[in-house]
């Protein structure tokens, strides 16, 4: 899978690193397209006027205590930046619908860069090159969650990928894209 993005100011950054990361993410898009039948339902991909993204769930079969990762690889279009956490605007985020069977962990974000939005003379945290957000969830992490899992054969994981994008002159309206995965539950025979 693609690596997290490097930005100027990141230790070890070399000019051109963004192109390497972008190529890796583009290759991941192609690999996801080839593997779609094999992992049917585990990949959500979409293009908007601002970005391309692929959202992947790591497991199709889970049992109590299984920790899964939701990874979203995002490629902003040329001249576009996406707000990062720590700004007063709609930052890129994975938001999951509450589910009595899941424990949601803290998301992992790459380091953003500081961007001067000249029309407002405002410094904001953004992603302007390819980046990845990872959110882990655990199925049946507590006794109550395991009891709920025993009543089911399938587990739906639903939510949204939310973001707000801008170019050098315009901040576009926030976008919320639905995400949904259905995983099969494996119950222990003990």
Regions from the PLM with identified roles:
Residues 6, 10-190:
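Extracellular/lumen-exposed scaffold segments
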